[in-house]
Swiss-Prot record:
Matches recorded under PANTHER family: AROM/DEHYDROQUINATE SYNTHASE, PENTAFUNCTIONAL AROM POLYPEPTIDE
Protein name: 3-phosphoshikimate 1-carboxyvinyltransferase
Cystine pairs: none
Keywords per UniProt: Amino-acid biosynthesis, Aromatic amino acid biosynthesis, Cytoplasm, Transferase
Organism whose genome encodes this protein: Coxiella burnetii (strain CbuK_Q154) (Coxiella burnetii (strain Q154))
EC class: transferase
Pathway assignment: Metabolic intermediate biosynthesis; chorismate biosynthesis; chorismate from D-erythrose 4-phosphate and phosphoenolpyruvate: step 6/7
Presence of keyword Transferase: yes
């Protein structure tokens, strides 16, 4: 399926975006190995998260999925209650699922194979294989990419590990393995990354130690069931935040969005560019802060993106580059080589698409330079990347003509009702089927 977006006369209204994808992954995983029943409200029923649910069910976890209410009811099997799955666990398109499950499965008393779709089978896994091996895990793979064969070792040993780059997925993988390790596992990161795993461990009553740069867990503890309500995903909200910011006449409100400080890079950067964004009605539930976000149209200016904001914005850069494309002046983004090993090479995909829409965009080995200009209509390829597809749908709200985006099926991995909500606030997006994603 492809998308076609035509220029908007302005966005308006109030919407609630679906539950946070990162928190959904972690919540169901921890609930599955907790003792007792956990109800998860606001679970994201996207393909990536449902792949995690399926994997846990295949290992004996009882998970009732109430899809139309976005609710899971999880009967935890306890720390030692998982069973060997009957076949390889398919993580679909989800890098988060395969990396979190690798940490969980490294300390089990059985062997497992983790695999995924063709995109996932190109994603780098050396970053988790090396530290897990230091803990005593044995993992076979060809070329350090999936499929991964994990030979479970219930006698893992805790380690002190310095992450070479800020990565919430790697950090979380090692913390999960640390739950099953003898002694203490401590992870030090060079810059803050999203901390949902740490917050959820606390929510499930697991003791951990944390300072400014390090987080430690000791093995042998227990998780206790605890109901959780998942806030809206700021990565999904970001598409509407940018669309309203760049489209004249816009004013929208996004309700109950997660505003974890480790995820606020997109708001911080847009404000640096001149955006009119107001965050109100702060509450905190299940250790996670939530708020309403009001956005009005504003004229933007290009900026040099500070390195300390990169880990806080890593998933939102595709749509942030759309904002940069219509800002006055030049925007420079560096230190984001990680974007080249996402679902697709996001640097190359964004530069290619922006150039096709008339924007001067230059690819760097670790980033991009964009000279703000006027978006023209045209056709771009999402390269089967959900965030690229939605970013260019946002571009179409301000382009001089229709923007057509090819190969958008993977939007279902993170935002199944994107088109519905986009049209509700006036973005004029429609799905089109046919050759080449149209």
């Amino acid at each position: 399926m492809g998308y076609q977006t035509i220029p908007s006369q302005g966005l308006s209204g109030e919407i609630c975006v679906p539950g946070d994808k990162s928190i959904s992954h972690r919540a169901v995983l921890l609930a599955a190995i907790a003792e007792g029943q956990t109800q998860v409200d606001g679970f994201l029923m996207g393909a990536d998260n449902l792949a995690m649910v399926s994997a846990l069910q295949q290992m004996g976890a009882s998970i009732q999925v109430i899809e139309d209410e976005n609710i899971l009811v999880v009967e935890g099997v306890g720390m030692t209650g998982l069973q060997a799955p009957p076949e390889a666990l398919d993580c679909g398109n989800s890098g988060t699922a395969i990396r979190l499950l690798s940490g969980l499965l490294a300390g089990q008393p059985f062997n497992t194979v983790l695999t995924g779709d063709s995109s996932l089978q190109r994603r780098p896994m050396k970053r988790i294989i090396d530290p897990l091996t230091l803990m005593g895990a044995k993992i076979d793979s060809t070329g350090n990419v999936p499929p991964l064969k994990i030979y479970g070792n219930p006698r893992l040993t805790g380690i002190h590990y310095q992450l070479p780059m800020a990565s919430a997925q790697v950090k979380s993988c090692l913390l999960l393995a640390g739950l099953y390790a003898r002694g203490k596992t401590c992870i030090t990161e060079p810059a803050p990354s999203r901390d949902h795993t740490e917050r959820l461990l606390k929510h499930f009553h697991y003791t951990l130690q944390k300072d400014k740069q390090s987080i430690c867990v000791s093995g042998g503890g227990k998780l206790k069931a605890n109901d959780i309500s998942i806030p809206g995903d700021i990565s999904s909200a970001a598409f509407f935040i940018v669309a309203a910011t760049i489209t004249p006449g816009s004013a929208i409100r996004l309700c109950r969005v997660g505003v974890n400080p480790t995820r606020l890079g997109v708001i911080n950067l847009l404000k640096m560019m001149g955006a009119d964004i107001e965050v109100t009605h702060y509450t905190e539930k299940n250790e996670e802060p939530t708020a309403d976000i009001t956005v009005r149209h504003a004229r933007l200016k290009g900026i040099d993106i500070p390195p300390d904001q990169v880990p806080l914005t890593i998933d939102e850069f595709p749509v942030l580059l759309i904002a940069a494309a219509v800002a006055q002046g030049k925007t420079v983004l560096r230190d984001v080589a990680e974007l080249r090993v996402k679902e697709t090479d996001r640097i190359a995909a964004m530069v290619d698409g922006l150039q096709k829409l008339g924007i001067a965009a230059e690819s760097l080995p670790d980033g991009v330079i964009i000279q703000g200009g006027t978006l023209e209509g045209g056709e771009v390829n999402s390269y089967d990347d959900h965030r690229i597809a939605m970013a260019f749908a946002v571009a179409g709200t301000l382009a001089k003509g229709p923007v057509r985006i090819r190969n958008c099926d993977n939007v279902k991995t993170s935002f199944p009702n994107f088109v519905e909500l986009a049209n509700e606030v006036g973005m004029n997006v429609k799905g089109v089927r046919g050759r080449g994603g149209f």
